[in-house]
């Protein structure tokens, strides 16, 4: 029983090490984590960010509208 438990612990530790290694290689997600949204009076489609008070930086957002508790952010 102790050998089986030790083997499971070794396998679990190895899995954690390899998972952490893969996460370090991926510098950032290649896509936005936002859903499409529409605000009245604004043309086009915005990005709906869930449970955020402001639009995140780095995406070029210039305007927004609130859809409580979310925010719809519009680029340019």
Swiss-Prot record:
Keywords: Cleavage on pair of basic residues, Disulfide bond, Hypotensive agent, Ion channel impairing toxin, Nematocyst, Neurotoxin, Potassium channel impairing toxin, Secreted, Signal, Toxin, Voltage-gated potassium channel impairing toxin. The keyword Cytoplasm does not apply. One of its GO terms (molecular function) is potassium channel regulator activity. In contrast to BDS-1, may have an alpha-helix which could be located at the C-terminal domain. It comes from Anemonia viridis. Moderately expressed in the ectodermal tissue from the distal and proximal tentacles, body wall, and oral disk. Belongs to the sea anemone type 3 (BDS) potassium channel toxin family. Residues 1-19 form the signal peptide. A motif (Cell attachment site) lies at residues 45-47. GO terms for cellular component: extracellular region; nematocyst. The lineage of its organism: Eukaryota, Metazoa, Cnidaria, Anthozoa, Hexacorallia. Its main location: secreted. This is Kappa-actitoxin-Avd4e.
């Amino acid at each position: 029983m102790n050998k089986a438990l030790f083997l499971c612990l070794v396998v679990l530790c190895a899995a954690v090490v390899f998972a952490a290694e893969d996460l370090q290689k991926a510098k950032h997600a290649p896509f936005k984590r936002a859903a499409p949204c529409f605000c009245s009076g604004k043309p086009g489609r915005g990005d709906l960010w869930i449970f955020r008070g402001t639009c995140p930086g780095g995406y070029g957002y210039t305007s927004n509208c609130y859809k409580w508790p979310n925010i719809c952010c519009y680029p340019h």
